[in-house]
Amino acid sequence: DMDSTLIQTEVIDELADLAGVGEQVRAITESAMNGEIDFKESFKKRMALLEGLSEEVLHNVAVNLPITKGAHRLMKALKYYGYKTAILSGGFTYFGNYLQKELGIDYVHANQLEIKDGKLTGNYIGDIVDGQKKAEFLQAIADKEGIHINQTIAVGDGANDLPMLNLAGLGIAFHAKPTVKENAATSISSLGL
């Protein structure tokens, strides 16, 4: 997972603040992460509120992402030992791709923002990456890399991470919402990555 896991923010909330709709979007995000409303529906509502936001704002947010303590060291160690890494996120490819370059991550699967004339349209391109899609991407990567799903590790914090966490050989709820902690086999709440 990316938001509130690999980075210490929910990017969509940051974008919403800059678009002047922060409180509205934050309330929808919280409900979705707690499993109170469907992720896909919440995603569409939040996207619509971002219409007109400048691509320049996206760049400024990307270069200032607060990367979780220990993430650089963890990714370097995983790479050294030959592990493949991925961002499977209900967030945005724009930021996932930035982190991929920054941290040397192998795969990124997230939602693609639709940008026209340098501004967000309030729409997205392709399928919404929800919990089920994250699990499907995890399985596809395992298949591509020739490993059994039991040899995978997934880390996440929100309700939309549960399908992926439950599919992985080791699923870790990281600084997770209460419902996620209750439903994940392993939970970490006090350390960095």
Provide a role label for each language-model segment.
Residues 1-3, 157-158:
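A short acidic Gly-Thr/Ser loop motif
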Residues 2-40, 44-45:
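Active-site neighborhood of HAD-like aspartate-dependent phosphohydrolases
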Residues 14-17, 27-30, 45-48, 60-64, ...:
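Charged/polar, solvent-exposed surface patches and flexible loops
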Residues 36-57, 61:
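Cysteine/selenocysteine-centered motifs that mediate thiol-based redox chemistry or coordinate metal-sulfur cofactors
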Residues 52-193:
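C-terminal cap/substrate-recognition subdomain and adjoining C-terminal extension
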